[in-house]
Amino acid sequence: MCEFNVILNGKVQFKDVIYSKVEGDNVVVKNILGEGKEFKNCKIVEVDVPNTRLVLSALKP
């Protein structure tokens, strides 16, 4: 199985992510334990499967 690390501003913000969804200007993720986190005013800029990275970027104001 492929679990991702969520990267924002060059730092790991959330680990073991198996689900992600864009909801408007937010990105919602869930990990293998079912715990969730919402990243407000962000977008997905890269999905790197070999390196298990889901890279987010803040939306410009």
Give a label for each model feature.
Residues 20-21, 28-31, 36-38:
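Structural recognition of beta-strand segments within beta-rich domains
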Residues 4, 36-61:
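C-terminal structural segments of small proteins and small subunits
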Residues 8, 31, 58:
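Flexible glycine-/small-residue-rich
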Residues 14-15, 31, 41-42:
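A generic local structural motif
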Residues 1-26:
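N-terminal acidic leader/helix
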